Amino acid sequence: MPEVVFSVDHSKSMRDQAVPGHNRWHPDIPAAATVKPGSEFRIECKEWTDGQIGNNDSANDVRDVDLAPCHMLSGPIKVEGAEPGDLLIVDILDIGPVPQTNGPNCGEGWGYSGIFAKVNGGGFLTDYYPDAYKAIWDFHGQQCTSRHVPGVRYTGITHPGLFGTAPSPDLLAKWNERERALIATDPDRVPPLALPPLVDGTLGGTASGDLLQAIANDGARTVPPRENGGNHDIKNFTRGSRIFYPVFVEGAMLSGGDLHFSQGDGEINFCGAIEMGGFIDMHVDLIKGGMETYGVTTNPIFMPGRVEPLYSEWLTFIGISVDHAENRNAYMDATMAYRNACLNAIEYLKKWGYTGEQAYLILGTSPIEGASAASWTSRTHVVRCSCRPRSSTSTSPRRQGPAEGR
């Protein structure tokens, strides 16, 4: 086993760890550990809400989750010799839930997925499913099942939802400027268009005093992906993957977490993956001056691993950029098209005995593929959502609904 450079006690909050992590992006968060280029190491991660969700049959905890401290990230890990303009190579060697443990903490033999309430985060289909729901998933090696979504069994593509490097002061200022401008276009929207810096709930690693206050005042929230990486939620970012992260500060300052047991493309219900605590083993290296050499100016480059389950048969649901309720055609609207593809898949699954909420959870947690099939040639954007029809879901599940919160 590689050296553990960031460890967590899953029975404790991230705030109470021997070396705490953080939940904001900021260039001045102190390093939690230092590694050399070419080294292999393990990072242990808390579940992203820091233990707010329990293994029970009520979705009240999902409904009432406090998003101010999310995501709880492990790190930052300083890489010796990394300088602005370099590329940080990160290889994922292994990843999984808490090893050989069954217990009350998320990742100890179980995980969860949820539909967030519209008034507290929402999801991709929040106008159709505005209430909170939750499903608990039990892990059986590489597979998982849920008492709240009967008849379903997945082979998980385990992956981290969130990893990234620290922003420079200038880049952080750009983030805050553009996201505040977006919020200003519709400041009363529910859910909000973006999340500005928030002092409440800020954790800045070992920072204290004036430094912690500066991090709280200006630190970027971790919900969106940005130039540094961040919350990409790419299901194929699993064992065997390689990522080229841009470096913006000395040492790169790599951080991450938000581990997932399984997820569909898009993580459409926001808390849509099967969330878990656990570990990730990594190898890191550097390409000096790599950002200029390889034209990496705005976002990381990903090379997905090849360990996902191989499915030879699929059902594919098509969505087009048409508002069917109003009979209105939109021009190349990929968001509308994917929403329609998901709604079409849900209506199909409901015919097999699932509730709409269960079907929504299935799309968020099963390894479905979403893709843009046509745009310019048809003017009406076409998106597909593909699901495996056999061995994943039963055709006659019991109608036991997922845990519900009102």
UniProtKB/Swiss-Prot annotation:
Residue segments, region Disordered: 387-406
Gene Ontology terms for molecular function: amidase activity
Protein name as catalogued: Acetamidase
NCBIfam families referenced in this protein's UniProt entry, alphabetically: FormamaseFmdA
Listed InterPro entries: FmdA_AmdA, FormamaseFmdA
Keywords: Hydrolase
Group of enzyme by EC: hydrolase
EC id: 3.5.1.4
Catalytic activity: a monocarboxylic acid amide + H2O = a monocarboxylate + NH4(+); acetamide + H2O = acetate + NH4(+)
Residue stretches of biased makeup (Low complexity): 387-399
Family: Belongs to the acetamidase/formamidase family.
Function field: Allows acetamide to be used as a sole carbon or nitrogen source.
